[in-house]
Structures are given as C-alpha cells and as structure tokens.
Amino acid sequence: MIDLLYNHSLDVYSANGEDGINEYILKHLELDSGVVLEIGAWDGFFDSNCANLWSNGSYNGILIEATSKLNIADLESRYDNINCYRELISSSNTLEDVIEKCKFDVDENNFVLASIDVDGDDLNVARSLGKYKPIILIVEPNGDVITRSNSNGSTIKELIDFGVDFGYDFMGMSGHVGRHSGNVYLIRNDYKDKFDICSKPWQQRGIILSEGLLY
C-alpha cells in the first residue's frame, strides 16, 4: 500500500496539513536542520508552511512577503535564526537574488524546503529560484484545475511538468479530503528513491481538488 502524503496531515500553523506532512518527509529523510524558505509569508505564522520548522530553532528561515503584514523588526528581534524581507519577486528581483542576500549560507545540502504561495504567479516565482534547489518544494496550484489553463494560477500538471524540467518529481498534495485542496509537493530527484510514492503514475499519488475529488 502506497503511503499518500495527506495521510500525515497535521496543522500547527499550516492550513492544509503541511506541518504534519513536512515532519513526515523530513523524518523519513533523516533531516533535522537546515534552511527553509517561505514566500507569501504573511505575518510569519498565519497559514505558514515553514513556521513550525524555524520557530523551534532547529532550522534557519528565510521569510519573504510583499506587503506590510510581515513585521520584520519584531520577528528578527525575537528569532535570531531568520531573515525577513519585504520584497516583490519579479524578473528583476528574483528569489535567487534574495537568497544571495541572507546572512547564512544556502546550498544544495542544507536547503531543505521552500514554500511558494503568491496567488497566481507561483510558477514564475518557482523558476526564479535559479541555482538554488531545495530538497522539497511546495507550490500552490489552482486547486480547481488539473490540466486546463483556463483561470488564474498554475494547474497541477503544469507544476508537475515544471518539476520534471527543474530536476524534481511529484510526491502528491496536501489537503483535507472532502474539504479543500492544498499544495503540490515536489522532491528533488536525488532524494526521490527514498519514497515508494514516486514509483507510481502521477495520477495515483494523491491529487486533491477543491471540490473534494481525489485522484
């Protein structure tokens, strides 16, 4: 029996079970430290997919938010293991550019997880990671659409295809079955063999739509 990601759902700060899924994946990979990045960080905690990792001190965090919701001075005064940036990611100010500015080293061995939730431009923002490739990449799709590009945001299949081109494989999705969809989980190819789920066709890896349909 294949162990689908959503079976490990648990929310501390996250909205769709990501905190529990992250814990499951990182424990399976025997990772307990490193760097995590969240773009679309809000105040650092609300619906966060990374706060449960950096707030306990085990991980360094890079928090990026384009609005004033992120109180940089307050957060950085309370946590010395995070860097906060009020930045709008664009073609002239990429994620790669922001990562280059942070106070701690980031490389392929310690860049554990990145979560991208920017309401519609997630795919372009993910591409702007450039040379920085986290082990786990969490990206928000348009939860209503698997393969059709008929509305705002990226389809699930577009994110899966991006992952293939970027050196990743699709692990499945977060979400609460029968309630709402969550995020697409991608794992870097040099780690995918540690999970049986990656041996199945992508349609069988746990796709949750906002209508509650499960594929």
Predicted feature residues:
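Membrane-proximal basic amphipathic "stem/tether" segments
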Residues: M1-S9, I208-L214
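Conserved acidic-Pro-Pro-aromatic motif
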Residues: V35-E38, N52, N56-N60, V106, ...
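SAM cofactor-binding core of SAM-dependent methyltransferases
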Residues: Y6-C102, N109-I116, G143
